[in-house]
Amino acid sequence: MEAVIKVISSACKTYCGKTSPSKKEIGAMLSLLQKEGLLMSPSDLYSPRSWDPITAALTQRAMELGKSGELKTWGLVLGALEAAREEQEQVTSEQAKFWLGLGGGRVSPPGPECIEKPATERRIDKGEEVGETTVQRDAKMAPEETATPKTVGTSCYYCGAAIGCNCATASAPPPPYVGSGLYPSLAGVGEQQGQGGDTPRGAEQPRAGRGAGHRGLRRPAGRGQRVRPAGGAALMAGQFDSEDRGSWYWGRLSRGDAVSLLQGQRHGTFLVRDSGSIPGDFVLSVSESSRVSHYIVNSLGPAGGRRAGGEGPGAPGLNPTRFLIGDQVFDSLPSLLEFYKIHYLDTTTLIEPVSRSRQNSGVILRQEEVEYVRALFDFKGNDDGDLPFKKGDILKIRDKPEEQWWNAEDMDGKRGMIPVPYVEKCRPSSASVSTLTGGR
């Protein structure tokens, strides 16, 4: 325990500065996490897989008991761990040795020289050293984690050669972009196949978020689960009137039109529409984490049976209607929206309905301000709203709703969102401009 406290304290002093928590506060937090069964060992805190469950549990505890001390400490510790991870300085036993003054090389970000890795890695926990091979460590990585090169040992990370390799001159991998995710989210915890899709149950699996690669609709977190939003933002409750159905219900709106209305809007902007494939059901479409997510809302009768379609949300009738989203049941759509004003769907709460003025308008660059970019890497696209492209493609920028994600159009007239780190601004030839502007 003491060794882990020293490591975490040193990391916090490096990345948090004067706001760094004390060793006493870190120790109290670790004791609580072990008591609650969130950590089998204090050193498990180094694993990114433990961060989301810890955040969810401490957030729920703070809101239920009004005790936010451990949550505040965890926020600082998490920030330090994420900062180290983003700089490719993951908390390993080698870095622990460095911080504790026990020797060992400090993890360095990849440079132009040959990138290397150690043959073995050891973890320090209560004086015990446990050997772990590189192959074993790589096999334990989560599917969404990115195996980034790091320099610690004496053999090349890619080919294993001690000297004389040419890996340093190989093509660099595409840069990371906002939304790709450095560690798995809680969005997929407890999900079952067929839950939360805009297709009949069992037709497709729900996706865990940008970068997961699955298509279809999503399932929100369960009751009481409060998922940490991107960037650690505080819980924000919506100010809209859930009883004003005209502000959020759009009727028979297609999925594509919903994406067009919500793409680029602030997190938490939403609308409710009729399901296009399951009559009588609805879809909650929400702008969150640089994408548009779609959550299926099943309509149930008094005995749990399916309701006939065409009645609209909460339409009066002889039999009361209930609404199922994920594993939560509500008496009406307004009560469902009220619930998600203060509970996270995945990374956001419901903040406001999309404005009706968006229906016939769009924010598009004026002709004299049109910009073009050239693709530096291939991009396959992870969401329905993404625009796939190949290295060397010329794209026309239509608008810039976010700093790291722009809305673009390719030479075939297809439109969608592109990651800014994957492209560079350019001045295409007149022939390319003619093609992109419709002169084909």
Curated annotation (Swiss-Prot):
UniProt-annotated stretches for the region Gag second part: 438-440
Sorted UniProt keywords: Host-virus interaction, Oncogene, SH2 domain, SH3 domain, Viral budding, Viral budding via the host ESCRT complexes, Viral release from host cell
Keyword Ribosomal protein: no
Gene3D superfamilies in the cross-refs: Immunodeficiency lentiviruses, gag gene matrix protein p17 (1.10.150.90), SH2 domain (3.30.505.10), SH3 Domains (2.30.30.40)
One GO MF term: signaling adaptor activity
Positions with biased composition (Basic residues): 212-221
Region: CRK, residue numbers: 209-437
Positions of short motif PPXY motif: 174-177
Record's keyword annotation contains Ribosomal protein: no
SMART domains for this protein: SH2, SH3
Pfam family, one: SH2
Residue ranges constituting the SH3 domain according to the UniProt record: 368-428
PANTHER family in the cross-refs: ADAPTER MOLECULE CRK, SH2-SH3 ADAPTOR PROTEIN-RELATED
UniProt-recorded name of the protein: P47(GAG-CRK) protein
Originating organism: Avian sarcoma virus CT10 (Avian sarcoma virus (strain CT10))
